[in-house]
Amino acid sequence: MRILMIVGDYNEDLEVRFPQQAMEMLGHEFHSVSPGKPAGSSVVTAVHDLSDTSLQTYTEARGHAFPVTHDFDSIDATTYDALVVPGGRAPEYHRCDDRILDVVRHFFESSKPVACTCHGIQILAAAGVLPGRTVTAVPFCRPEVEMAGANWVDRGLDGIEVDGVLVTASTWMSNAPWMRAFSEILNGAAV
């Protein structure tokens, strides 16, 4: 299968690297694109730490370079079987890019599998594809999810929610069950 992931500077490091490695390990063709960044370039990721419960928010450090494998402007969304929407900081500005929102809408209108984690839900909310769905995400996104017409469920920081062919996860701590559920959907198995 051909899997597309839209990436940008300061996506969460583990939320881009883990899906890429998991999908490639399973034999899928995995492409990453970023508006304004050509194939062969990279985005800079962010490393988020939620473990210090004395803080009211998470900490952030510069992460690794993550490769952009294809030009965003040259992709044809109809040639992809599934979409991965990672979180981190990139969704803050990606949700304002109509080209990204159009790609996201294509996957939902075509009932293709979508895996979304953490702040990536901001892109789905902006694309208008959440009404009537049950999803999870990092708790900071709950107001946006509910204003977008979805039912937000608290699955902790390491949980997931499956709604049809949409798999949402709370944070990078959900990576293993998130990708397991996504791969089961890709394989046509009931989750």
Predicted regions: what they are:
Residues 116-120:
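Short, thiol/selenol-centered motifs that function as redox-active sites or metal-ligating centers
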Residues 1-110, 123-134, 142-191:
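Extended, subdomain-level signal for the structured scaffold at the beginning of enzyme domains
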Residues 111-115:
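ADP-ribose/adenylate-binding Rossmann-like module
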Residues 138:
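Active-site-adjacent substrate-recognition loops and nearby beta-strands
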